[in-house]
Amino acid sequence: MGASKVKQDMPPPGGYGPIDYKRNLPRRGLSGYSMLAIGIGTLIYGHWSIMKWNRERRRLQIEDFEARIALLPLLQAETDRRTLQMLRENLEEEAIIMKDVPDWKVGESVFHTTRWVPPLIGELYGLRTTEEALHASHGFMWYT
């Protein structure tokens, strides 16, 4: 057998064209400097709006405090009236309960002073129901 002639593939005359191997990505978005400028601008605007809101909130808070200060004498007068009414009712109840005890002075202070001493919760609500005493000492805490 004779050796067969092998035909080898050869490039075309003049060679192959150049091969494009680089990535051809389109330019997307803003540049880094413009994004930095937008970020700084957003931060400055955010700080400005927070400062503006804090000033408004402080103004509203001062207004609330002034309203509370204006209403405080009225609220204190109501509390004093309620306290004196309860003390008067307690004295009447004490007179009824202790009428048979000799040498008992109704309304005698346990403190040896002539100054006004605000009554304790136990003094005010000693002759009241347990619910009233708990409500006075703890308020609305059991709702939360």
Swiss-Prot record:
Membrane topology according to the record: Single-pass membrane protein
A GO-annotated cellular component: respiratory chain complex
One Pfam family of this chain: GRIM-19
Source domain of life: Eukaryota
Keyword presence, Nuclease: no
Membrane-crossing residue ranges in chain numbering: 30-51
Location in or out of the cell: Mitochondrion inner membrane; Nucleus
Keywords: Electron transport, Membrane, Mitochondrion, Mitochondrion inner membrane, Nucleus, Respiratory chain, Transmembrane, Transmembrane helix, Transport
GO biological process, one term: negative regulation of DNA-templated transcription
Chief localisation class: mitochondrion
Sequence similarity: Belongs to the complex I NDUFA13 subunit family.
Role summary: Accessory subunit of the mitochondrial membrane respiratory chain NADH dehydrogenase (Complex I), that is believed not to be involved in catalysis. Complex I functions in the transfer of electrons from NADH to the respiratory chain. The immediate electron acceptor for the enzyme is believed to be ubiquinone. Involved in the interferon/all-trans-retinoic acid (IFN/RA) induced cell death. This apoptotic activity is inhibited by interaction with viral IRF1. Prevents the transactivation of STAT3 target genes.
PANTHER family linked to this entry: NADH DEHYDROGENASE [UBIQUINONE] 1 ALPHA SUBCOMPLEX SUBUNIT 13, NADH DEHYDROGENASE UBIQUINONE 1 ALPHA SUBCOMPLEX SUBUNIT 13
Assembly behavior: Complex I is composed of 45 different subunits. Interacts with CARD15, but not with CARD4. Interacts with STAT3, but not with STAT1, STAT2 and STAT5A. Interacts with OLFM4.
The protein, known as: NADH dehydrogenase [ubiquinone] 1 alpha subcomplex subunit 13
Upper classification of the organism: Eukaryota, Metazoa, Chordata, Craniata, Vertebrata
